[in-house]
Amino acid sequence: MNNAKKFKVYFDGEEKDYFRTFFGAFSLTRHFTPESYLALQLSSFSTQEHETYDIQGQYWLNEATGAEQLGVGTYMEHARNRLRASVFNAGLRFRTKFTGHTLQAGLNWQLEKIKENAREWEMRDSMGYSLPHTPDMLRLIYSLHSANEVQGNRLSGFLQDSWRFKSKLGLFNLTYGVRLSHWDWNKETTISPRISIGLLPAANDHWTLRFATGFYYQPPFYKELRDTTLVNGIAKVHLNRSIKSQRSIHFVLGGDYTFRLLDRPFKFTAELYYKALSNLNPYSVDNIRVVYYGRNMASGYAAGLDLKLYGEFVPGTDSWLSVSLMQTKEKIAGVWLPRPTSQRYNVSLYFTDFFPGSTRWRSTLKLAFADGLPFGPPHTDRSQQTFRAPAYKRVDLGVSYRLINNEDHHLTRGLGRMIKNAWLGVDAFNLLGIQNINSYFWVTDITNTQYAVPNFLTGRQINFRFSIDF
């Protein structure tokens, strides 16, 4: 290990957060025939978010092999953030069937009202000096103030047809359509045509093949509108009325193959995809907070391969093995950077089966091995957020015993007649006690050098459980 450091920190302070959300929905459907209907759908939600904290940390940073002291300091984070949002939605849905076709159409109107008032600042001190250190004035390492309101109307509609037909090649399912949307806040109108086709080959009905392509848009919501300019640690926030929806052109090719092995059903699924991305609104991740740039300033792509094998060892429960490969990058100011979601590989296993000769004892095994995500110091440019966390590795093992087996409904009296199964189990989560990293705490010394100190996820845990299936 090179350049090892020792780090000690003490925290104090308090955080009080408040999140309250109300949902409501209403639907009225008129059936003209068994195959045709018209539906009116109304929905609304309202949310209030209060984020309030004052957190102080005092730390010591030393060389691991000696007594040289690199940093002794304090940092304090302060926030008083308030957000209130109300969204009302009204829509019409129509569906009918005729001669192998299923026709669907819809219209939608959405009203949004959002108000934000946010104040944040962060102070860092090292060796008795406030960072950044300037001899003629006192400055904070970071501060932000935002007071904004948004009110807008979104109109959208779609038309789609699904056509099932047979030929010498097999049974086809062709789905094609178009979606239109308009937002009066930024005066943007988008048109999104899409098409997909599936084939069940006549030569081998164990296979299902499919291909899909189309234009997909991600309309911006409030967080994506916040154009944050950071100059000397001072963040200025204004809402970008010229923001556009992020666009993706999808090409997806896939297939399923079903078969039997060891007298059990299996299914193998493969999917290859490429997505051309444009009008990207870059973002960074600070712990669990997503911060958008608020500008369409990048293009990019995502390409990958997903493989998955399903098997049913316990009736009604799938076991599976999946392998995923992916690369996604974005181009900002002529430089290609990995996107925050760039997880290059992911291998996972879920296996459950009864003990040999028994239907009462059951074991469950979970394995996960995944690439770490890109990261970097908070409040920095995207070009500095290309470090990559170590791979995530985890093993879970569980054993269950069936106390009651009433799947044949032989219990006909009392509470037992309502119970299908009753299980008693024990699980070992993170069986090997691997120290996986959740996030990083950044420490700055007097030379303004930053060090990433890992925050680890929970180690090994033993869990006891009791469950009843009705």
How would you describe each model-predicted region?
Residues N2-K6, A202-F251, P265, L272-Y292, ...:
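Surface-exposed extracellular loop regions of Gram-negative outer-membrane beta-barrel proteins
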Residues Y37-Y53, S242-Y301, L424-F429:
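Membrane-embedded beta-barrel scaffold of Gram-negative outer-membrane proteins
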Residues F165-L169, Y273-A276, R295-P377:
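Gram-negative outer-membrane beta-barrel transporters
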